[in-house]
Amino acid sequence: TRVGVAGTGSYGAGLSRALNAAGLTVVEVARQDRQARRRRGKSDPLDAHQAAVAVLAGTDTAIPKSGDGAVESMRILLAERRSAAKARAQVMNQIHALLITAPELVRQAFRALSGQRLVNTLARTRPGSEASADPAVVARQTLRRFAVRQLTMQAEIDLIEQQLDLLVRQVNPTLLSLSGVGPVTAATLLVAAGDNPDRLGSRASFAALAGVAPIPASSGQRTRHRLSRGGNRHANAALHRIVLLRIRHREPRTMAYFERRRAEQLTDRDIMRCLKRHVANEVYAALLNPAADNPAGRELRAHRQAIGIPISVLAASLGVPYQRLRRLEIGTRADPELERRATIALDAISPPQTA
């Protein structure tokens, strides 16, 4: 049974997870054509009917993210990290702005410092009494509080990146083995694909998702393509960072391709776009072959088979989709909570061992 749900990445996320847990196939319903909506009108019953028609007709076939595993945890952490990074940049701008307008004695004391040295020095200062009305004292107090705030944001970012590193190594260590891919970049790409990357049917679909698939813009005898402005822009930025790092570190394959395409009269910008597409192909292969090191999943499978319980029966008793439990058992997914629940369920039905 297929069910069409609109907004599976926002208001429909909870409904989508519940339907997946019930064993139903969820299909993402795209936004209706505006011209057709103006002609038919707008209401909840009409929208529901149109969604059902789209699913039955097969015009909407996109499978949404399952949002029920470690990759969903990465999405939450990345959102927190972006917020902390924005706050860190904002407070640095406030420090520089205050130093520009502060009294000369304050400006002179910190003029030779910049960057993290400036922040560390400001955080160690003792600005004086809080009851003072002297602008120089108040400026020092404010600068110290700004510096402490910046250090707090940096500590939060470091902690988040440690968590992301652990999660990525559990879910897909293959991504980290690619040149130019770190924990944050890997997590960004994993979040773009979701907990169920097999929903992306081809390399081209992942390239379109990441906004690196060129859009045909030919006319007559002129053949050309234009840049895609759509797709997941976080994933697009992650691919861009990978290419920049490979060029910066003179990665042999990248530089050989760069020089060959430059000899073909392509601009550096066009070559960057081509390289991003090649990197997207590498990432897609890694997403489908994660080689996750999850021996606990294999042990769970051996335990289940020793008891003689079919995987479909165990999945139904746990209230989870069969595919989710299967990915855990074959080692392509890390899911400590599901692993714990499955172990408890198997232990409860295991026959007592006789001496």
Regions inferred by a protein language model and the residue ranges of each:
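Short alpha-helical DNA-recognition segment
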Residues: 308-326
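Phosphate-backbone recognition surface of nucleic-acid-processing proteins
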Residues: 177, 183-264, 268, 343-355
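A short, Lys/Arg-rich alpha-helix, primarily the initiator
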Residues: 288-306
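Short alpha-helix plus adjacent loop in nuclease-associated cores
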Residues: 17-20, 26-65, 72, 76, ...
